[in-house]
């Protein structure tokens, strides 16, 4: 049994409103039943751990193996396919561990990682990420979404491997309809498998800036038909940024009614789209602010780090929130708090985490900032000073110190 008393805790912008929180057996409690250690935060800001809803650990950190020239989605898929031919379980594990090390020290305590499944890679990536899931459970909760990056119906053998991974415990089933000759057929088949295995769904969807040819309607229809509300997420959906206001709001209301959730991946989506424009290049991001206003559960996430989909990244969700706020011209305190929620509380809602937060009964996953307010964390891209998973300290960061003459 372990217990901790957190004193002089600040939960918002009011520096005078300091609180005391109690942690016992890895959860926040109203009072302690045993002696405890005390952590005096001296007025530092405490927030619940950040939640990464969409990342690819298996293909991270491979830029040195790729030749980038066009910077398009098609090139990214092709270059990754070529690099994937040399992936080993040890290699995937080592690169995934690099990202997890960064993510943990950036304050992430829960992560959904997508893992590619196809006849070329087989279950190599999946097995490596399962090992990471076990080895890093002390600091971060990993859930695995297996998906057919290379297509499903046009890639024989893929479905059998997906089913094998699901039977082995993969928590989520993903999709990538635009890689199949018949995107709608892939969507329908994945819904059938999701029902068979009782899994949530997470699609890569509508990933360009052409408003024509959207498949979002088929996802909405299947969600209604099969009663999968709250269990379906669509990522990217950059086509939404090309819709006029009235059309967008109609789609947003349909998403909200169906219970389909949306994840925006700002770094990747900005890097890969709009290259056909020399001037007046669009800011092709899913407009979360408008979707949220219509009742859609939304999140922001990293997607890729150090590969042809996104050649950069430090696994900071705060940086992604700041990037989205900047590009989307969101700057008021309320808007910045909403951006923060899309990497924390709303992300937890999207992943259906049952015990997220800072109230009694919630898991004691939290991070500490030297920032004047939660909104300032996003505005200033503040790095967390320390983090805890289930009441156990997982990292600390030394504060910079000026050396005046």
Which residues does each PLM region occupy?
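Di-metal (Zn2+ and/or Mg2+/Mn2+) metal-binding site signature of metallo-dependent hydrolases
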Residues: 44-66, 208-209
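N-terminal metal-binding scaffold of metallo-dependent hydrolase/deaminase domains
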Residues: 1-35, 374
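C-terminal cap of metal-dependent C-N hydrolases
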Residues: 349, 360-405
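Histidine/acidic residue-rich metal-binding segments in metalloenzymes
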Residues: 124-138, 154-261, 277-300, 356
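His/Asp/Glu-enriched, well-ordered alpha-helical/loop segment
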Residues: 200, 221-232, 268, 272, ...
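Active-site gating loops and adjacent loop-to-helix segments of metal-dependent hydrolytic enzymes
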Residues: 61-92, 164, 197, 215-233, ...
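Active-site metal-binding motif and surrounding structural segment of the metallo-beta-lactamase
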Residues: 33-47
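Alpha-helical scaffold segments that flank or form the walls of functional sites
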Residues: 63-114, 120-135, 160-167
């Amino acid at each position: 049994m372990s217990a901790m008393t957190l004193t002089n805790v600040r939960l918002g912008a009011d520096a005078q409103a300091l609180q005391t929180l109690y942690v016992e057996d890895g959860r926040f409690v109203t009072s302690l039943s045993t002696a405890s250690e005390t952590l005096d935060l001296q007025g530092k800001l405490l927030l619940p751990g950040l939640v990464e809803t969409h990342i690819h650990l298996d293909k991270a950190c491979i830029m040195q193996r790729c030749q980038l020239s066009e910077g398009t989605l098609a090139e990214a898929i092709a270059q990754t396919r070529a690099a994937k031919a040399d992936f080993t379980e040890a290699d995937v594990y080592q690169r995934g561990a690099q990202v997890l090390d960064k993510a943990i020290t950036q304050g992430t305590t829960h992560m959904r990682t997508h893992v590619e499944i196809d006849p070329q890679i087989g279950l190599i990536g999946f097995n490596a990420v399962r090992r990471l899931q076990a080895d890093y459970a002390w600091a971060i909760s990993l859930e695995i979404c297996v998906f057919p990056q290379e297509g499903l119906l046009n890639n024989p053998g893929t479905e059998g491997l997906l089913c094998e991974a699901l039977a082995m415990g993969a928590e989520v089933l993903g999709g990538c309809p635009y890689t199949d000759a018949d995107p709608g057929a892939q969507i329908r088949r994945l819904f059938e498998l999701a029902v068979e295995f009782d899994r949530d769904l997470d699609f890569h969807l509508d990933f360009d800036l052409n408003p024509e040819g959207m498949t979002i309607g088929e996802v909405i229809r299947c969600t209604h038909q099969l009663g999968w509300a709250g269990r379906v997420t669509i990522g990217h959906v950059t086509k939404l940024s090309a819709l006029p206001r009235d059309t967008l709001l109609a789609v947003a209301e349909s998403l909200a009614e169906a219970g389909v959730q949306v994840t925006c991946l700002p770094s990747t989506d900005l890097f890969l789209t709009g290259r056909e424009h020399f001037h007046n290049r669009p800011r092709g991001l899913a407009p979360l602010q408008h979707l949220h206003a219509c009742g859609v559960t939304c999140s922001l996430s990293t997607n890729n780090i150090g590969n042809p989909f996104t050649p950069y990244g430090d696994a900071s969700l705060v940086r992604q929130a700041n990037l989205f706020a900047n590009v989307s011209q969101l700057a008021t305190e309320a808007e910045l708090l909403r951006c923060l929620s899309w990497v924390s509380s709303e992300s937890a809602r999207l992943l259906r985490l049952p015990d997220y937060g800072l109230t009694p009964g919630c898991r004691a996953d939290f991070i500490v900032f030297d920032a004047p307010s939660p909104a300032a964390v996003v505005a200033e891209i503040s790095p967390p000073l320390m983090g805890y998973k289930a009441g156990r300290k997982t990292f600390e960061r030394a504060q910079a110190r000026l050396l005046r003459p």
